[in-house]
A protein has these predicted regions:
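Active-site-adjacent structural elements in enzyme catalytic cores
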Residues: 2-188
Length: 188
């Protein structure tokens, strides 16, 4: 993506999601993965009603290196078979994941490819990724050397907007919005 390499699958394919969990060694009920969507209208299917101030932030930041935690729609638990109240959603500024999402017609569910190395947090070399995952996944796409800084994670589910992780995406513009309470300031 526009941040670090990720591993993902079709959000609507339960067997692929189970396989992704197996590859990442994650228990399905502890799933904390993000969805890669193609555009803002795509987000509305997977997030509950988005208030105007939050929508303005999404519109300003996306596509870009941000993951927004939003209240999940009723569609999310049915897909993932878990009772998740929130979901991380991304629209990366990168042609490869956006082309995959458009071709599938569904978002991708994804997770960053972490590295066991204590010096570097993320694997950035596509050849190294291929060697690690070639027998575990259907395809590895070489998008060139990846970045080593993850997306900024912004939680929009509480009383105030909270920066959970400061990553590649500039969060300074959120200073203007720090006192917004979702659902309370819809006139902004």
């Amino acid at each position: 993506t526009d941040t670090v390499y990720g591993i993902g699958c079709d959000l609507m394919n339960r067997k692929s999601i189970e396989r992704l969990c197996h590859v990442k060694n994650i228990k399905p009920h502890k799933l904390n993965l993000s969805f890669i969507c193609s555009d803002l209208s795509n987000i509305s299917e997977y997030a509950r009603k988005i208030d105007t101030p939050i929508f303005k932030i999404l519109k300003k930041a996306l596509p870009g290196p941000y993951t927004f935690i939003l209240e999940s729609s009723s569609k999310v638990p049915k897909i993932l078979d878990v009772n998740k109240k929130s979901v991380g959603i991304r629209i990366p500024y990168h042609n490869i994941p956006l082309a995959i999402v458009k071709q599938l017609g569904n978002p991708l569910i994804s997770a960053s490819i972490k590295d066991d190395d204590i010096i570097k947090e993320y694997t950035t070399d596509p050849e190294e990724i291929y060697e690690t995952f070639k027998h575990k996944v259907d395809i590895v796409i070489d998008g060139g050397t990846g970045g080593n800084i993850a997306s900024s994670v912004i939680d929009c589910t509480g009383e105030k907007i909270v920066v959970v992780r400061k990553g590649l995406g500039d969060v300074e513009f959120l200073g203007l919005w720090s006192d917004i309470r979702p659902g309370k300031n819809s006139n902004i």
